[in-house]
Amino acid sequence: MNYLGFDIGGTKCAAVLGNREGRVLCREAFPTEGPDATLEKLFQAAESFSERACAAGVSCGGPLDEASGVILSPPNLPGWDRVEIVRKIRERLGIPVWLCNDANACALAEWRFGAGRGTRSMVFLTFGTGMGAGLILDGRLYSGACGNAGEIGHLRMERLGPVGYGKAGSFEGFASGGGIAQLARAAALEQFQQGKFTAYCRTPADLDSVTDKSTAQAAEAGDPT
């Protein structure tokens, strides 16, 4: 039996077809847009796959109402307010559908097929547009009473610092892709104020184009900033 997986991220989305052994048979990815445009692309990808799936799972950053299958209003998905994603996919594809927090879905996959195999307890950290955690405790996924047990991105690390989910100095602010870009822009601005520049940002006009990817590339190339 094969299964569909839809991952909805703040930067990009993906549709995959896989089997029970965790092998990916087909995959398509594309930039995230609004809910209607993104869903249509996910549907088209699923319908283009050569084999039919018997069920589908959707992973998405929270907050979610997993029981009713609704994406509430994730901070990294502007415009995705109360999207009844499970109903929409079920009606279009005619198969059972489940919604799961993306970090929890990753934790389950890693525990079942990856580095967590054979463990009783583990923590999976996600670092993307935002950040979060999935918890496997004593052989079971632990999501908490309201499904937010892994929302560690809200933890405050410093009184001041880059902003993640509206909170300065939060774990997400320091460690997510968006937070890393904020830190890199601040470092570049400090260099400009000293009459210097960085390899990843040579003029103040380039500040808005600094991303986590360009920052990582500069670090790999040996930029001391």
Could you tell me what each predicted segment is?
Residues M1-L4:
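Extreme N-terminal starter segment of soluble prokaryotic enzymes
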Residues D7, D102, G128:
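Active-site glycine-centered loops adjacent to acidic/histidine catalytic or metal-binding residues
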Residues T11:
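Conserved Rossmann-like nucleotide-cofactor binding loop
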Residues V16-R20, C26-E28, E33-A37, W98, ...:
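Glycine/GP-enriched mid-protein hinge/lid loop-to-helix segment characteristic of carbohydrate kinases
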Residues N19-R20, C26, S59-G62, E66-A67:
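Short, conserved active-site loops that position catalytic residues or coordinate cofactors/metal ions
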Residues P35-F43, E47, C54-A55, D65-V123:
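Glycine-rich phosphate-binding loop and adjoining helix at the ATP-binding site
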Residues S59-C60, S73, F127, S176:
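A secondary-structure boundary/capping signal
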Residues C60, A67, N101, L137-D138:
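A cytosolic small-molecule/anion-sensing beta-strand core signal
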